[in-house]
């Protein structure tokens, strides 16, 4: 199953908001590279939710529940519907990811402003070994 990561500013929309709402339309993605990730998502894919402000960290998981579609409010953007899955007991901080030096080529580390991306298999394996996934 493919994994993706989606960043959000918790002051705008947090994992707690998604938990309360149960589902949401994941929108606001504009960069071409991030849009490629949105367009690659399919129902059942897992999305790691990353808070980009405060302590930058992967804080929980959601699941894609729709096929990608054009954003009816923004002709240059695409959206997917996601459903809350769970909050992680222990967030995985960007600092921890960077300090491992195992993922220096991952977009999360290399392209700090990229909002949505795929998660490489080696990152998924590492998160599973930490009992996060």
List each language-model region with its residue ranges.
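Short, charged beta-turn/beta-strand-edge "cap" motif at the junction between a beta-strand
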Residues: 50-56
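Short, basic/aromatic beta-hairpin or loop at an interaction surface
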Residues: 14-29
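Hydrophobic beta-strand signal
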Residues: 48-49, 63
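Contiguous surface segments at macromolecular interaction interfaces
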Residues: 1-11, 30, 69-133
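Short alpha-helix capping/helix-loop boundary micro-motifs
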Residues: 27-38
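Short beta-strand-centered aromatic/proline hotspots
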Residues: 57-67
